[in-house]
């Protein structure tokens, strides 16, 4: 039996392949920050209740409460805001890592048989 193909040659094809589907990861940072937002909301309610309670009162203790309330309130808000920003940065970093892993260089090596030419 005569073959229609003669010797084969090796060919190589390289390409970049995107595995999986792209995930925008929308809402990931929001999910992480939700407990912090809840805590900030409760803190704000507590502070407004405390301010309402001492409203119109005078004295050394009241002055000290107001001073501590303002001082600690700003520190807490700044710390929690920094945590929220860190969450967003970590989600962005995670997204970059996933995108890097999703994209892979693929090289295919195969033998291609040449058809026999008519004599």
From Swiss-Prot:
Q: Which UniProt keywords apply?
A: Coiled coil
> Does the UniProt entry include the keyword Coiled coil?
yes
Which parts of the chain are coiled coil? 63-104
Query: What's this protein's name?
Result: Uncharacterized protein YvzA
